[in-house]
From Swiss-Prot:
Residues 37-232, 290-303, 353-379, 453-471 are lumenal. This is Protein wntless homolog B. One of its GO terms (cellular component) is Golgi membrane. The keyword Transmembrane helix applies. It comes from the Eukaryota. Disulfide bonds: none annotated. GO terms for molecular function: Wnt-protein binding. The chain crosses the membrane at residues 16-36, 233-253, 269-289, 304-324, 332-352, 380-400, 432-452, 472-492. Enriched in the animal hemisphere of the early cleavage embryo, where expression persists until the late gastrula stage. At the neurula stage, strongly expressed at the border of the neural plate and dorsal midline. After the neurula stage, expressed in various organs, including the eye, liver, heart, pronephros, otic vesicle, and dorsal neural tube. Expression in the developing eye is dynamic; expressed in the eye field from stages 23 to 27, and from stage 30 expression is confined to distinct regions including the central part and border of the eye. InterPro entries: WLS-like_TM, WLS_GOLD, Wntless. The gene is wls-b. It is a multi-pass membrane protein. Keywords: Cytoplasmic vesicle, Developmental protein, Golgi apparatus, Membrane, Transmembrane, Transmembrane helix, Wnt signaling pathway. One of its GO terms (biological process) is Wnt signaling pathway.
């Protein structure tokens, strides 16, 4: 009688496989913790206040804060007032990166936010619900001697969320407000070496444009991007893991197709999980180094969403197939109540992503976080997603408990057998329970990773620039997913061992009567493992 490798492999060999996987898991964490730098970094240049007295402010001239032809600048708005320079003639110019440095495609993306230094004045304070209007123009070039080329231009409105930490008195004039950062734009690729931002704050008293926004002293143009060193480590992991998963996936399915019976649902789902893991592994990001693929962020989110949906569905089906009787199992339609919400949630996440990153493919200045309603909806969406992830984990724990109880109940219904055979089944049950505990640990870390990434993205958009993601957590979780999928396909592949009347996997004998009784009890059910067949045995009361 043949089963899966997890049941027929000797304890010594199984322990060796487990130790090897554990060492690889530790290595995945160490790669991020000891080799890779932190995933993201940022530059924070202070914009130069340039003077532009041309009648047509929207002409093709670009104002540089430094270089061979720097703009004429002022130090403060008081100087502008003394020189009778109007606010409409002042342009905040910022160059990214700082001098003597270059941007690189290895940075993958660039998120730009503004940090305003606003001073309190009794005759010029920030009014409630004030909006700031930004006339933004962005240019790029790949050589310091080239002319600037326009990348994007738009007039955007952003809400000012500022708090004055002291009383509004004459004595506190000049004190700065505590303001949230203002999301400006997001680029899905960093394909050019130099970027130039020219930002104007147009004033129009008749239209109440930029009135009641306080006295702006300085503007910080903060650029957040992926660390190039982390990108190299990430690409290297993907390049190494992709062929490993493809090879084990082909080997697994070849063994399945060599069997006389057709594959059962559990085996198909394991194979589908391998496909989704391969989809997220394939390092197509290498092409983003040479091509300006601005859609890579959206494509990466879609790949990760497909894998999440497949992984969560697999855990539900994996537990369910070890709970149901043979008459109910092996049909995907049975799981519509559990898999349906996962599919619906994945579609909601896709729509949410398309509403921001999809629109940003045409308008990089668009952000759902720029309005009160949009920010509240986005934050509520993140909170609900986190709550749903926690509820899913609790439900999975309940299903695992049900599986354990079902296996124990079915085991008690087996006919009396020899001590050696009972020990054999005790060993199988122990191995299965250990795998289920590993599954729960995997699920817990996946939920934590999902919530962490969602909160982190919210912090980027809402202004918490002090957060530092742990590279070891990223590489460790990514390695864990691959090792888990690899282990499933290896351990649940059909074994080539067949045990006759005189042996078992531990070398223990069994009488022909006992073998006949056991065979008629559970082996008429198709399935990858003995425990799978045992769990689906129909009650004979």
């Amino acid at each position: 009688m043949a089963g899966a490798i997890i049941e027929n492999m000797s304890t010594k060999k199984l322990c060796m496989v487990g130790v090897a996987l554990l060492l690889l898991q530790v290595l995945a964490f160490l790669v991020g913790g000891l080799i890779a730098p932190k995933p993201t970094t940022y530059v924070n240049p202070v914009a130069m206040k340039c003077i532009d007295v041309r009648k047509s402010h929207r002409s093709s001239k670009w104002l540089m804060p430094w270089g061979t032809e720097p703009c004429k600048s002022i130090q403060s708005f008081d100087e502008a007032a003394n020189r009778l320079i109007e606010a409409n003639d002042i342009v905040f110019a910022a160059h990214i990166p700082n001098s003597q440095f270059e941007m690189s495609p290895w940075f993958q993306f660039m998120l730009v936010v503004l940090q305003l230094d606003i001073a309190f004045k009794l005759n010029n304070y920030i009014e409630d619900h004030s909006m700031v209007t930004l006339d933004v123009a962005v240019a790029y070039r790949d050589d310091l001697k080239e002319e600037w080329k326009e990348l994007a231009r738009s007039v955007e409105q952003r809400k000012l969320n500022c708090i004055l930490p002291v009383d509004k008195t004459v004595a506190n004039e000049g004190r700065h407000y505590d303001c949230d950062v203002i999301p400006l734009m997001e680029l899905g690729s960093v394909s050019h070496k130099y970027y130039l931002f020219n930002i104007r704050l147009p004033v129009n008293e008749r239209q109440k444009m930029n009135i009641g926004i306080g006295e702006i002293r300085d503007m910080h143009v903060v650029s957040i991007f992926q660390n190039g060193g982390f990108t190299m480590v990430w690409f290297a992991m993907k390049t190494f893991l992709t062929p490993c998963i493809i090879i084990i996936m082909i080997w697994y399915w070849r063994r399945i197709t060599m069997m006389t019976r057709s594959p059962v649902l559990l085996e198909k789902v394991i194979f589908a999980l391998g496909i989704s893991m391969t989809f997220i592994n394939i390092p197509v990001e290498w092409f983003s180094i040479g091509y300006d693929w601005t859609w890579m962020l959206l494509f990466g989110d879609i790949r990760q969403g497909i894998f999440y949906a497949m992984l969560l569905s697999f855990w539900i089906i994996f537990c369910g197939e070890h709970m149901m009787d043979q008459a109910e199992r092996n049909r995907i339609s049975i799981y519509w109540k559990q898999v349906g919400p996962i599919a619906f949630g994945s579609c909601c996440l896709f729509i949410f992503d398309m509403c921001e990153r999809g629109v940003q493919l045409k308008n990089p200045f668009y952000s759902i976080w720029t309005t009160d309603v949009g920010a509240e909806i986005a934050m509520a969406f993140i909170i609900v997603a986190g709550i749903c992830a926690c509820l899913y984990f609790l439900f999975l724990c309940f299903m695992v408990y049900q599986v354990f109880r079902n296996i124990s109940g079915k085991r008690s219904n087996l006919p009396a057998m020899s001590k050696a055979r009972r020990l054999h089944y005790e060993g199988l049950i122990f191995r299965f329970k250990f795998l289920m505990i590993i599954t729960l640990a995997c699920a817990a870390l996946t939920v934590v990773f999902f919530i962490t990434t969602q909160i982190t993205e919210g912090n980027w958009k809402l202004g918490d620039l002090s957060i530092e993601l742990n590279s070891a957590f990223f590489t460790g979780i990514y390695g864990m997913w691959n090792l888990y999928v690899f282990a499933l396909m290896f351990l649940y592949a059909p074994s080539h061992k067949h045990y006759g009347d005189g042996q078992s996997n531990d070398g223990a004998g069994m009488s022909s009567g006992e073998e006949l009784q056991l065979t008629t009890t559970i082996t008429h059910i198709d399935g990858p493992t003995e425990l799978y067949r045992l769990a689906g045995k129909e009650a004979q009361e």
